[in-house]
Structures are given as structure tokens and as C-alpha cells.
């Protein structure tokens, strides 16, 4: 999938235009851009600065109705996927391009940080991903450390 199409999917289809989110470009050497909102760069994507940013951004903010399970072990994926299917939740599993996997779970409403934390703990995943101030590697973009694409491996 094209990165811009995916960003549009997050904003329009999943977020229903109610949830703007931050994007950033980072490199391993510590080079980073300012956090910029989706609406700021994607509405005027023909502007050369915005076009460059969209083409190069590789991190995004976790959405208020999204829970991200950050896992290192591949063998943990299938039991979690089974449970998410039983709960009839919308989810996508990505190989992060770094060491592990991200399971993105999209809920029907916004969650508090505490609710996200409880769900993350239930699956014994990285609790740092409960914060609204946490950036994650952007789907279909090169990871800032490895330069490998964060790619979809499973979803419903």
C-alpha cells in the first residue's frame, strides 16, 4: 500500500476526520523533523515542503482509539490474533522493520491512557505504547533504524 493512501485511510476511514495525528521524519543519527499534523501536510500535498515530508515521514502518533501491542516474539502473534478475532476487533499485524511486531487494534471509541495500559498489560506487551505522546514506526515506510519497510503480515 502507498504511504499517503494509508495515512488517508487512518484519517478518513478509521478516524472519520475526527482525529488528527502527528507525523515525523527520523534518522538513526538523531536527525529529526518537528512533529507535524496530518491535516497540515496532507491537505496541501503539492506544496514542495509538504510533499517532501509525506514522502519521507517514517513515524506517527498512536490514535486515541488505537492500541498498539509491541512484541518481539513471533510465536506470541497467533494466540493474540485468535483472541482478537474472537472479540471481533479490527486489527492489523505488522513486521516493524526493526526487531519485532506491532499489532494495531482499532476500537470503536477513544480510550483513556489507563484503558490502553490495561489492554497492553493483558497481552504482556510494551507499556510505553499506552502513551499518546509515543511515536511508532509508520506503516509502509522505512524504519528509522534499519531502513526496512514496516509491512503488513496479518489483518482482518
Language-model segments: residues:
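Histidine-centered divalent-metal-coordination microenvironment in nucleic-acid enzymes
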Residues: 66-69, 81, 90-113, 135-139
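Generic alpha-helical secondary structure
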Residues: 74-77, 112-116
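Short amphipathic alpha-helices in soluble, non-transmembrane regions
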Residues: 114-124
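Structural alpha-beta junctions
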Residues: 85-91, 122-125
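Short amphipathic alpha-helix segments
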Residues: 74-88
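DNA replication initiation on ssDNA origins
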Residues: 1-67, 75-78, 125, 131-156
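Secondary-structure transition/turn motif
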Residues: 72-73, 104-109, 152-156
